[in-house]
Amino acid sequence: MERQVLLSEPQEAAALYRGLSRQPSLSAACLGPEVTTQYGGLYRTVHTEWTQRDLDRMENIRFCRQYLVFHDGDSVVFAGPAGNSVETRGELLSRESPSGTMKAVLRKAGGAVSGEEKQFLEVWEKNRKLKSFNLSALEKHGPVYEDDCFGCLSWSHSETHLLYVAEKKRPKAESFFQTKALDVSASDEEMARPKKPDQAIKGDQFVFYEDWGETMVSKSIPVLCVLDIESGNISVLEGVPENVSPGQAFWAPGDTGVVFVGWWHEPFRLGIRYCTNRRSALYYVDLSGGKCELLSDESLAVCSPRLSPDQCRVVYLQYPSLAPHHQCSQLFLYDWYTKVTSLVVDIVPRQLGESFSGIYCSLLPLGCWSADSQRVVFDSVQRSRQDLFAVDTQTGSVTSLTAGGSAGSWKLLTIDRDLMVAQFSTPNLPPSLKVGFLPPAGKEQSVSWVSLEEAEPIPDIHWGIRVLHPPPDQENVQYADLDFEAILLQPSNSPDKSQVPMVVMPHGGPHSSFVTAWMLFPAMLCKMGFAVLLVNYRGSTGFGQDSILSLPGNVGHQDVKDVQFAVQQVLQEEHFDARRVALMGGSHGGFLSCHLIGQYPETYSACIARNPVINIVSMMGTTDIPDWCMVETGFPYSNDYLPDLNVLEEMLDKSPIKYIPQVKTPVLLMLGQEDRRVPFKQGLEYYHALKARNVPVRLLLYPKSTHALSEVEVESDSFMNTVLWLHTHLGS
């Protein structure tokens, strides 16, 4: 069998990985202006950006490709590529101007060493670079934020100014004993005078600047910056409240000011990556007087403000603050001229049948409005799928654009003048690029999709969704009658299922989910002959707010039992080899994997844990998300929390370290030394405990890697070591 050959020959697995890892993924798309041909036809260009792993350069490369879409205003007549792909090097951000005649690009260039790189803001027009500004040399601010949390690059409606977010310029600092700074002739009076803005402050060279945690380590104090394209002048906007950090900004109607999200950073910052619950609000700062106005509830959390095409309305997502990191959100509408805020879509406690289960997305697409400024289009997890939806902002009615179609998952890249650009994939189909027009209100389910880039299905992979109902003794008393799901991938060419080993993968979060989309590792393992079980235990997103709220206070118990129940059900129904079952999980998935080999040591023959949570007690004082430790253990979080014996006992009771004496499963640990979310000392603590008890354990420590272990060199090495570990402990 092919499975046995690949398991016994690592080079075969490496060749398979090299092939499948070449599958690119879409990262962005934008639509050019509408053009009328000399014969009266209409067409638009679609500019797409992709990423792909390059194993020879050991990096993720970015490239772009353009397509032409001919249409009649309501449907696509013809579509196809307009040339080959071109690699884009150094681009951090790019944005088309409102008219489509110009494009702004933030680019890094310069030294080979990371710290020597410079940032340039370029303005392109037609076939030439119109302007280029060396932001690093101008020294108005620090590095520009290119992330999707704070970062933005926004054209003014007049197309004369650019708005972006950058790190606040830090004062120069030096030692008291730096010779060139000493001035022995200065009098006491001169020493007491205020320092000049550009004069170095003595003794401040080691002052601590608190950052925003995982993947945001260089980002501390963001400021809003405006570039005047004609004059080249850069101004840092004033009026932003001192207690918030601004981001996700755009120009207000008429360019009278700037709308932005402000995140509270007092009394200190918590990690913001993957955390939609950070206290924040929507603000407007007037450019003429510098007055700042609060536009939303300041006690909650907001993100993704998006201005309608008619410049009359702003929609945004709103979440409870200091609760589970990710949960069902509300969609709000702010009328710019009446100043009235209205709720469009509320939190959904439970999904009723096949109905809408709520909004579960961390960001709305930059382009999400219909042409008439009445409907908003977005993608959201719905159980174990991700679908596209249109919501009428006047009535609040939500309609699926993809229900009843192919059972994969969709992602909206953009919509402009009702032309949608979307990505579609399944567990055995890499991402495809599709376009289609948003139908009139009431006919949303009749979208006609046209493929611009069609991926080839990966053969010999069969997949499906399993609906699971916990047994009566595992019901949650407060949130009863909740079900959950698992996605099962299995080789379709296996003549004898009893010889098929299985890898069980619980997701991280815990409030995230697996969806029926393309994922490299599960597809790879399935091609090698493994069945792969992806478990969306109770607490996963997409199943209603009640499911999410059922887990805090029950981690290490409810989620563990759900995964074990899913494993037992699938083994019973599919008759896979129960002697060869392995676990593989990262973060909270690693937490569950280590729990399972301690609570059910007879079930699992191998375990791979990536940056796992091991001891919630010791994690509390070292992670960038101490609120996670409290909330998921079942306690409210407050910034002034001090250790409490009862709380610490509960944390320990819910930690995998408690079950160390029962563990006998061989464990492969993979840790990122720069992980701020689950510091690598967590895995090291587990490693020492296993070594002391003679349990087979191997530790891989990646020096420059972060929580996701997603760098190309790290990802490829971790996969090959996973294959070797499975081969050693499951056999072929």
From Swiss-Prot:
<dbReference type="GO" id="GO:0006508">
    <property type="term" value="P:proteolysis"/>
</dbReference>
<feature type="active site" description="Charge relay system">
    <location>
        <position position="707"/>
    </location>
</feature>
<comment type="subunit">
    <text>Homotetramer.</text>
</comment>
<dbReference type="InterPro" id="IPR002471">
    <property type="entry name" value="Pept_S9_AS"/>
</dbReference>
<comment type="function">
    <text>This enzyme catalyzes the hydrolysis of the N-terminal peptide bond of an N-acetylated peptide to generate an N-acetylated amino acid and a peptide with a free N-terminus. It preferentially cleaves off Ac-Ala, Ac-Met and Ac-Ser. Also, involved in the degradation of oxidized and glycated proteins.</text>
</comment>
<comment type="similarity">
    <text>Belongs to the peptidase S9C family.</text>
</comment>
<keyword id="KW-0963">Cytoplasm</keyword>
<dbReference type="GO" id="GO:0042802">
    <property type="term" value="F:identical protein binding"/>
</dbReference>
<feature type="modified residue" description="Phosphoserine">
    <location>
        <position position="187"/>
    </location>
</feature>
<keyword id="KW-0007">Acetylation</keyword>
<dbReference type="InterPro" id="IPR045550">
    <property type="entry name" value="AARE_N"/>
</dbReference>
<dbReference type="GO" id="GO:0031965">
    <property type="term" value="C:nuclear membrane"/>
</dbReference>
<dbReference type="GO" id="GO:0050435">
    <property type="term" value="P:amyloid-beta metabolic process"/>
</dbReference>
<dbReference type="GO" id="GO:0004252">
    <property type="term" value="F:serine-type endopeptidase activity"/>
</dbReference>
<dbReference type="Pfam" id="PF00326">
    <property type="entry name" value="Peptidase_S9"/>
</dbReference>
<feature type="modified residue" description="N-acetylmethionine">
    <location>
        <position position="1"/>
    </location>
</feature>
<dbReference type="GO" id="GO:0008242">
    <property type="term" value="F:omega peptidase activity"/>
</dbReference>
<dbReference type="InterPro" id="IPR001375">
    <property type="entry name" value="Peptidase_S9_cat"/>
</dbReference>
<keyword id="KW-0378">Hydrolase</keyword>
<dbReference type="GO" id="GO:0005829">
    <property type="term" value="C:cytosol"/>
</dbReference>
<feature type="modified residue" description="Phosphoserine">
    <location>
        <position position="185"/>
    </location>
</feature>
<dbReference type="InterPro" id="IPR029058">
    <property type="entry name" value="AB_hydrolase_fold"/>
</dbReference>
<protein>
    <recommendedName>
        <fullName>Acylamino-acid-releasing enzyme</fullName>
        <ecNumber>3.4.19.1</ecNumber>
    </recommendedName>
</protein>
<feature type="active site" description="Charge relay system">
    <location>
        <position position="675"/>
    </location>
</feature>
<dbReference type="InterPro" id="IPR011042">
    <property type="entry name" value="6-blade_b-propeller_TolB-like"/>
</dbReference>
<feature type="active site" description="Charge relay system">
    <location>
        <position position="587"/>
    </location>
</feature>
<dbReference type="Pfam" id="PF19283">
    <property type="entry name" value="APEH_N"/>
</dbReference>
<keyword id="KW-0597">Phosphoprotein</keyword>
